Design a protein with these regions (language model features):
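A detector for short, charged/polar N-terminal pre-domain segments
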Residues: 1-6
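Short basic helix-loop element that most often maps to the first helix and adjoining turn
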Residues: 9-28
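Conserved hydrophobic/aromatic packing and binding residues within compact polymer-binding modules
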Residues: 11, 25-26, 36-39, 66
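Recognition helix of helix-turn-helix/homeodomain-like DNA-binding domains
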Residues: 31-46
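DNA major-groove recognition helix of helix-turn-helix/homeodomain DNA-binding modules
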Residues: 50-65
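Residue cluster at the C-terminal edge of the helix-turn-helix DNA-binding motif
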Residues: 28, 46, 57-58
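Short, Lys/Arg-enriched C-terminal cap helix and immediately downstream tail that follows
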Residues: 14, 48-49
Length: 68
């Protein structure tokens, strides 16, 4: 599995661990809901570092954790 595929999977797993819906997570992170769903479903395989930083901050993890 490539890191591109793992990003969406990891974002979803960390979000679920926090008990956040996609909508709530999108609002808290400042990332558009549609962008978040595309990341989690691997439509967007390479999100920008800016978006990754926003997601990682709310999830309480590093960007590196999201790409492992």
């Amino acid at each position: 599995m490539t890191s591109e595929i793992k990003i969406g999977k990891n974002v979803k797993e960390y979000r679920n661990k926090l008990g956040l819906s996609q909508e709530d997570f999108a609002k808290k992170s400042g990332v558009k809901y549609t962008t978040l769903t595309k990341i989690e479903s691997n439509v967007i395989k390479k999100p920008s570092v800016f978006i990754m930083a926003k997601l990682a901050k709310i999830l309480g993890v590093s960007i590196e954790d999201l790409i492992k």
